[in-house]
């Protein structure tokens, strides 16, 4: 029986080719060297600015506050009381303006919103001042369509 043509010769040849390729790449690496010279960035500033890195948003397992806080400045806390002195009555009659003693931390927008909510009138403008006794006084000017005297009667201090 004649010997069959060997198919094992081809893998040896291909493995020899891969070995030659490996040897050539190794030669290239040896010629090039492992520690190649890299181009460095020239620093022109003496201060080192830390680079901005990725900051992921927090994903808490549970909320740290069990109950949300009640609103700290509601309409009833904003307006402490109406002012009904003689000069306040003159402002009501002449300038269509209501006077209130308000919370010291309330701002003009909060005062206007509180007047709108409690007395159903839209104020034209709000002026404030801090009195010498440390309380805040608000002058709430009403629109010409609304009479301040009627609102004062509705509040109940006339």
Curated annotation (Swiss-Prot):
Organism from which the protein derives: Puccinia graminis (Black stem rust fungus)
* Database matches in PANTHER family: 60S RIBOSOMAL PROTEIN L23A
Question: Known Gene3D superfamilies for this protein?
Answer: 3.30.70.330
Q: What does this protein do?
A: This protein binds to a specific region on the 26S rRNA.
CC annotations in GO: ribonucleoprotein complex; ribosome
Keywords, ordered alphabetically: Ribonucleoprotein, Ribosomal protein, RNA-binding, rRNA-binding
Asked if Transferase is a keyword of the record, the answer is no
Which BP terms in the Gene Ontology apply to this protein? Answer: translation
Q: What is this protein called?
A: Large ribosomal subunit protein uL23
